[in-house]
C-alpha cells in the first residue's frame, strides 16, 4: 500500500512538471500538509508544513506560514514560528486543531493534535520488532521459527489516536504489513488489537516492559500463525 502511494506521488510529480514546465515548483505547495501531531503533556515541539517525496520522508515546505489553534484549547498554544507548547496539566487524550495559512492564503491547512501522558499509555511511539522472540515465563530469548507471515524485522507504531500499524514507513522499501485500532487495559497489562488491513479477527495480547521502557514483550493470548506457542514479539526503541 505504501509502495503504491510512493509510486503515485512520483508519477504525479512527473506529470505536473511536464504539463506546467516551471510551474512544477508548485507541486510542494499544492501537496503540502501538516498531518497528525502527537505530543506529551508538559513538552514543546516544532511543527512544520511538509510535502511528500517518492522515495523517502516528507520535506519541510519553504514558505511563509501563519499559525493558529482554533478553537482555542486551554493549555495548548503555538507561536509564530510554529513552536507548539502543551502545559503539563493538560489531560491525557485532549485534542486540538492547528491551522496553517500558507503564503497569505495560497493554501490553508489543518492538522489534529493529540496530547498524551506516557504513564497513561506507555505504548505510544515507534518500536522495532526484533527478529528474535521471547518464550516461556522466564522470557527466554531465542531465534524464531521461519514464517512467511512474519512481522519481525519491521516497525510497530502505537498512536495516541488509538491506531496502530506494522511495516516500514519510508524509502522505496516502504511496506504496510498490518494496521488497525487498539485498546489498552493498563491495569491488567493487556491490549486488544482490531486489524482493519488486512481484515482479521480481533486478537488479545499481554505486554511486559523490560529495561525500563526500552523493551516491550508482546505475547498473544490466542494462537498466532507467526509465533510458536508460549512465545511473543520483542519490540525495541
Show which residues each predicted segment covers.
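Short solvent-exposed capping/turn motifs at the termini of beta-strands
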Residues: 51-55
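Lipid interaction determinants
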Residues: 19-36, 40, 44-46, 56, ...
Amino acid at each position: 500500500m505504501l509502495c503504491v502511494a510512493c509510486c503515485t506521488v512520483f508519477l504525479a510529480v512527473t506529470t505536473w512538471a511536464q504539463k506546467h514546465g516551471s510551474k512544477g515548483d508548485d507541486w510542494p505547495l499544492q501537496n503540502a500538509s501538516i498531518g497528525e501531531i502527537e505530543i506529551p503533556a508538559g513538552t514543546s515541539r516544532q511543527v512544520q508544513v511538509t510535502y511528500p517525496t517518492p522515495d523517502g520522508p516528507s520535506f519541510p515546505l519553504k514558505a511563509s506560514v501563519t499559525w493558529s489553534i482554533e478553537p482555542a484549547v486551554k493549555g495548548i498554544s503555538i507561536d509564530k514560528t510554529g513552536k507548539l507548547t502543551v502545559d503539563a496539566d493538560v489531560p491525557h487524550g485532549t485534542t486540538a486543531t492547528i491551522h496553517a495559512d500558507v503564503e497569505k492564503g495560497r493554501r490553508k491547512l489543518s492538522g489534529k493534535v493529540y496530547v498524551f501522558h506516557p504513564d497513561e499509555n506507555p505504548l505510544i511511539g515507534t518500536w522495532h520488532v526484533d527478529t528474535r522472540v521471547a518464550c516461556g515465563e522466564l522470557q527466554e530469548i531465542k531465534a524464531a521459527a521461519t514464517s512467511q507471515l512474519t512481522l519481525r524485522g519491521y516497525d510497530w507504531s502505537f498512536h495516541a489516536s488509538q491506531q496502530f500499524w506494522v511495516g516500514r514507513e519510508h524509502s522505496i522499501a516502504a511496506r504496510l504489513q498490518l494496521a488497525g485500532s487498539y485498546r489498552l487495559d493498563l491495569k491488567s497489562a493487556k491490549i486488544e488489537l482490531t486489524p482493519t488491513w488486512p481484515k482479521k479477527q480481533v486478537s488479545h495480547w499481554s505486554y511486559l516492559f523490560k529495561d525500563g521502557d526500552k523493551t516491550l514483550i508482546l505475547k498473544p493470548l490466542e494462537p498466532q500463525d507467526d509465533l510458536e506457542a508460549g512465545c511473543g514479539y520483542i519490540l525495541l526503541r
